[in-house]
Amino acid sequence: ILQHPDIDFPYSEKYLTAAHKKYHELVFELKDLVISTDLDYHPIYKDRTDYYGLIPNPIKLDKFDNLKKTANKRIVIFHGVNRSNYYKKGNYYFDSALCIIRQKFSDRIKLICVTSLPYAEYIDSYREADIILDQTYAEDQGYNALEAMAQGKVVFTGAGASFCERYQVEPNSVAIHTIP
């Protein structure tokens, strides 16, 4: 498990309990097949006989406004943190980078930083953003990043070599691959 050695992850650790393992095994007994919607899970299941394959998350594009940037507007950078996954998602790298960006470009940017918001509030809070800081340590973007990309935002997230190969895109063309 990728995590900071000096920090507890009680939210994640519940998935390692005997009770959760028993529940997981029950679900797997009752399922017909496994479908992955994310490249991060694809390698885990790819050799299983009951694995249907990878089907990317669908998104309804007409539900999003593709807001146009106005001239001479400050660049708005949004960083939304789920506190329980702060280290696992690599948010400390973004926080460190934002300190430098704030010092060098405070007159040209606006930062919006939020923590542990419910989904609807989270999505609404980044509406004016130009740049979204999503996560590191990932091969594929998460659903929030996918929705942000659908709105024409620049997203820093997982978009590595396997992402580019799978979706037949050039590196950093639809999302910026973020690695520590």
Feature map (PLM): residue ranges:
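Membrane-proximal helix-turn-helix segments that form the acceptor-binding/catalytic region
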Residues: 4-34
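Acidic anion/phosphate-binding donor-loop and adjacent secondary structure
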Residues: 43-74
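Conserved donor-binding/catalytic core segment of Leloir-type glycosyltransferases
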Residues: 63, 68-89, 95
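Short alpha-helical segment that forms part of, or immediately flanks, the ligand-binding pocket
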Residues: 123, 146-150, 164-165, 169
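A short alpha->beta transition loop at the rim of the catalytic pocket in nucleotide-sugar-dependent
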Residues: 130, 152
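Aromatic "clamp/platform" in nucleotide-sugar-dependent glycosyltransferases that forms part
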Residues: 137
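Short hydrophobic beta-strand element within catalytic cores of glycosyltransferases
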Residues: 154-158
